Swiss-Prot record:
Keywords: ATP synthesis, ATP-binding, CF(0), Chloroplast, Hydrogen ion transport, Ion transport, Membrane, Nucleotide-binding, Plastid, Thylakoid, Transmembrane, Transmembrane helix, Transport. This is ATP synthase subunit b, chloroplastic. InterPro entries: ATP_synth_b/b'su_bac/chlpt. It comes from Lotus japonicus (Lotus corniculatus var. japonicus). It is a single-pass membrane protein. The chain crosses the membrane at residues 27-49. GO terms for cellular component: chloroplast thylakoid membrane; proton-transporting ATP synthase complex. Its main location: plastid. Pfam families: ATP-synt_B.
C-alpha cells in the first residue's frame, strides 16, 4: 500500500508539532511583538477610529437635526393646511347658506314675476274680449241701423210722391228758418 502522504509530498517534509502546552520562552512566543503591534495599532488607530466614529456621529446628528427640521416644517405646513381647510369649509358653508337663500329669493322672485305676467295676460285677455264685444256690438248696431235706414228709405220711397216730398222739404225749411230767427 502506498503511503498516504504521497499525494501531498510537502507534508512529508514537515516535522511534527509535538504536544500541546505552554511555551515559557517569551521571545519564542512573540507576546512582546504582539503587544507592540497591538499598542501601535491602538495608539495610531485610535485617532483614525475616533475620527471615523466622530464623523459618523456628526452625520447621524446632522441627519437627526434635518429630520427634526423637516418634521417641524411638515407640522407647520399641516397646521397651515388645516387652517386653510377650516377657512375654506367656513366659506363653503357661507356660500351654501347664501346660495340656498339666494336660490329661494330667486325662486320667489320668479314666482312673483310669473304671477304678475299671468295677471297682465289675464288683463290683456279681458281687455281684448271687452274690445271684441264692443266691436261686435257696434257692428250689430251699424247693421241694425243700416237695415232700419234701408227699411225706412224703402218705406218712404214707396209712400212718398213728389207732392209729399215738396211739402216735407218746405216744412223742414220753415222749421230751420224759425230756429234761425230764435237764435238771432
Amino acid at each position: 500500500m502506498k503511503n498516504i502522504t504521497d499525494p501531498f509530498p510537502c507534508l512529508g517534509y514537515w516535522p511534527s508539532a509535538g504536544s500541546f502546552g505552554f511555551n515559557t520562552d517569551i521571545l519564542a512566543t512573540n507576546p512582546i511583538n504582539l503587544s507592540i503591534v497591538i499598542g501601535v495599532l491602538i495608539f495610531f488607530g485610535k485617532g483614525v477610529l475616533s475620527d471615523l466614529l466622530d464623523n459618523r456621529k456628526q452625520r447621524i446628528l446632522r441627519t437627526i437635526r434635518n429630520s427634526e427640521e423637516l418634521r417641524e416644517g411638515a407640522i407647520e405646513q399641516l397646521e397651515k393646511a388645516q387652517a386653510r381647510l377650516k377657512k375654506v369649509e367656513t366659506e363653503a358653508d357661507r356660500f351654501r347658506v347664501n346660495g340656498y337663500s339666494e336660490i329661494e329669493r330667486e325662486k320667489l322672485n320668479l314666482i312673483n314675476s310669473i304671477y304678475t305676467t299671468l295677471e297682465q295676460l289675464e288683463n290683456y285677455k279681458n281687455e281684448t274680449i271687452h274690445f271684441e264685444q264692443q266691436r261686435a256690438i257696434n257692428q250689430v248696431r251699424q247693421r241694425v241701423l243700416q237695415q232700419a235706414l234701408q227699411g225706412a228709405l224703402g218705406t218712404l220711397n214707396s209712400c212718398l210722391n213728389n207732392e209729399l216730398h215738396f211739402r216735407t222739404i218746405a216744412a223742414n225749411i220753415g222749421m230751420f228758418g224759425a230756429m234761425k230767427e230764435k237764435n238771432n
